[in-house]
Amino acid sequence: MIEDNKENKDHSLERGRASLIFSLKNEVGGLIKALKIFQEKHVNLLHIESRKSKRRNSEFEIFVDCDINREQLNDIFHLLKSHTNVLSVNLPDNFTLKEDGMETVPWFPKKISDLDHCANRVLMYGSELDADHPGFKDNVYRKRRKYFADLAMNYKHGDPIPKVEFTEEEIKTWGTVFQELNKLYPTHACREYLKNLPLLSKYCGYREDNIPQLEDVSNFLKERTGFSIRPVAGYLSPRDFLSGLAFRVFHCTQYVRHSSDPFYTPEPDTCHELLGHVPLLAEPSFAQFSQEIGLASLGASEEAVQKLATCYFFTVEFGLCKQDGQLRVFGAGLLSSISELKHALSGHAKVKPFDPKITCKQECLITTFQDVYFVSESFEDAKEKMREFTKTIKRPFGVKYNPYTRSIQILKDTKSITSAMNELQHDLDVVSDALAKVSRKPSI
């Protein structure tokens, strides 16, 4: 045993030359914090370069070449993952990164508080708007956007979501969207949506003259399906967004689209989140469908995550379903867009049956109508098809969500799988006992 430990220690101290590329926001002190991680782990840096990110104008990419041992590299890799976006790691031939005894997999949150490490990796921050954004030249709007972004960036798991006093202009914009969409919902939205929307009006203040507070909405969802809301400053990467769903956490923007064009937004805003997503997150079957996509993404390859994100896009965002022999909408992108909601059920839109193997290859369009929409027989049908599809995703482990600790159980060996089976057996015993009692009950 001692010899084994010595061998493992020697193995972990093998040295080599490795290079890493990670991205940082262009802010004072960002690089110093990242390099301090190398210093604290006593890693010798051989070369450092910086360049402006080709993907995001507000970020810089840092290239680091270093002399490092296996143990140091594992530590630094996971510390950097918590503070930066690690783009690539070039390892010596004799190195492999390991985590909990597994071959290298992309970092993913193991407990709900770990979302603090990835919820702020937004693609745009605050007042950083593209030139074609309706609010690009509006300094007052940009300042307001930064206010909402700062609220989200300062949020930590367990905090109450700050209450916001919305401006008259924001409420008017919300009201315009709310009024027009509610004219279409009875003939376009699925029955589950129509069932939950009145409950949100009753318990969360969904009204034309009132923008609901995220804290109230989050508390409502917790009681209905166990989902909660977490404020976010803007777009997240597919991996970071889907990882939240694994914990039944929905990352939700709080800002309102620009008033100059209330029927268009190039990005998700609170109208999209609250009117498009929330009513169906209050539906148990749909909530389960969303969480299972999130769980499938944990530790998956970039290619697999992209496929899952595309399936999410064409179901949760732009999905159609059949009800009473007619097409109905359950996708949030459609339920929050007056023009595309009309178009999707106009009879002129191209519609195909939902098949994840085909859907995952379809191009996602952001600023125009989709070229095609996918229709599911039901949420259960979509869920079963996604379950079969996720079996094709290669991971050296399985995952199971523990709702009591709000953490992820990694099923990677006999011990962890046996533990999960014992929990399942207990649940089956409870159900079997209940069935036995019901069957013995005399009929009236």
UniProtKB/Swiss-Prot annotation:
SUPFAM superfamilies: ACT-like, Aromatic aminoacid monoxygenases, catalytic and oligomerization domains. Pathway: Aromatic compound metabolism; serotonin biosynthesis; serotonin from L-tryptophan: step 1/2. Disulfide bonds: none annotated. GO terms for biological process: aromatic amino acid metabolic process; bone remodeling; mammary gland alveolus development; platelet degranulation; positive regulation of fat cell differentiation; regulation of hemostasis; serotonin biosynthetic process. Keywords: Iron, Metal-binding, Monooxygenase, Oxidoreductase, Phosphoprotein, Serotonin biosynthesis, Ubl conjugation. One of its GO terms (cellular component) is neuron projection. Pfam families: Biopterin_H. Ubiquitinated, leading to its degradation by the proteasome. Ubiquitinated is triggered by phosphorylation. Residues 19-94 form the ACT domain. Its EC number is 1.14.16.4. The modification Phosphoserine is found at S58. L-tryptophan binds at Y235, R257, T265, S336, I366. Gene3D superfamilies: Aromatic amino acid hydroxylase. Signal peptide: none annotated. NCBIfam families: Trp_5_monoox. Homotetramer. Interacts with DNAJC12. Belongs to the biopterin-dependent aromatic amino acid hydroxylase family. This is Tryptophan 5-hydroxylase 1.
